[in-house]
Amino acid sequence: MTSRSSQGDAAPFLTQADNTEEEGAPDPGGHSSDEEEEEGKDHGKEAHLLTGISYRHSVTIVIILFYINLLNYMDRFTVAGVLSDIKEDYHISDSNSGLVQTVFICSYMFLAPVFGYLGDRYNRKLIMCIGISFWSLVTLLSSFVSKQYFWLFLLTRGLVGVGEASYSTIAPTIIADLFLADQRSRMLSFFYFATPVGCGLGYIAGSKVTSTAGDWHWALRVTPGLGLVAVLLLIFVAKEPPRGALERKSDRPLTNTSWFSDVKALLKNPSFILSTFGFTTVAFVTGALALWGPTYLMRSRRVIYKTEPCQGGICNYDDSMIFGGITCVTGVLGVLTGVEISKRYRKTNPRADPLVCAVGMISSAPFLYLSLAFADTSLVATYAFIFIGETLLSLNWALVADILLYVVIPTRRSTAEALQIVVSHLLGDAGSPYLIGVISDQIQKGKAPSFLIQMRSLEYALMICAFVGVIGGGFFLATALFIEKDRKRAELFSQGLLPADETDAERIVVPKRGRSTKVPVSSVLI
């Protein structure tokens, strides 16, 4: 046991928590690309034997989950792409415009723990089918709300959160039960491509459909039909894998503990808590930029070119289109870059994942600030700085998800996903769009209305994002201090070497500083 422990401490942190070691396995740090490919094939065969799902079918399931993720983000940011039209149609202020996104996030946030609890205990495929069907129906209904009933439009947009809560707490755990190690990282990165691509397509589709149909309501009628296709794919193609089958090293089945025990254990997991707060800052920044970015660029264009984007109820969507394109490209580029850098850095540093996240957050802050500072003089420079800043922000999407999956035991992952969603949205993008709108309104109060005042007020409000980004980097740096210990504890549980709850009954007495001391079994095994 001693030799094995020392080897585990010295070995490079190449793979994630569920990459279990075999006796006589070569040092992961010395793997060539051919060896990694062979290892991937072996993992695929092993996964098929343990889950009863072939590698090809597993990839197909991930593609379906990617499609669902894409649709949900596309629907969410279609609203952001036509926000100027919504504001004109309902005659609302900046703060009320921010509420359109905030009510959705609040609904999503409060429903996430419910679906997290259900996802750890019941059929995950059925839960997603029900949630997505409801989301498609409510999204369609929201497109028929007339301009006299803004409160009803807010209500329907809030209910849309059911769909995202039903899949976002569950989909990553299904991927975790289908793949191991680097394969899991790659599949998670592919799944999270849908976040930026869906955001960008939402801006583009919203603006294109609105300009073609001459009515922004039609933009909300695109995704419901596609949601029905997603439900059919889940029913007839997707298959649910057994929970934690790939990670068990004994015949002892994984058993659920009570929800309160799950939450108590998660609150004692510093890597989970700190990475969740780090991701909260990501949600704050991206939520504010996603809703207000196109609107701010439109206002900047008014100041620079002395033009009026919205004339006769029709708005100029060049900025929404460009912002959407940038979001797509930078998201894919950032996720790919983050995963690849972390994979290579992990060979020499086991804390690679949180460190890459920290560098991305801290580095993005000055570029976000510069994008705002140059907006009234050069839109080209603004777009360039937005491109760099959003790329750096996107480094962490797949890495944060991977951190959660390898520091949390399989029977608590949906609950952990739900808690992370609640915290990140409660303190992040649930309030940031509304907060930015309120600050903008307060800055404008008492001043003569002008294009310059409208732009400046939103500019100063959005500068908060740069400071929040630096704070997020600090949380990820703190995560790096605990990541190894929490990862090993989750590994030991998955291998049947550690119970889910470390009470006094699972502690042993060891000599420490000349006296007998009770310590957790995990501290000895590690």
Swiss-Prot record:
Its main location: membrane. It comes from Xenopus tropicalis (Western clawed frog). The keyword Transmembrane helix applies. Keywords: Lipid transport, Lysosome, Membrane, Transmembrane, Transmembrane helix, Transport. This is Protein spinster homolog 1. It comes from the Eukaryota. GO terms for cellular component: lysosomal membrane. It is found in: Lysosome membrane.
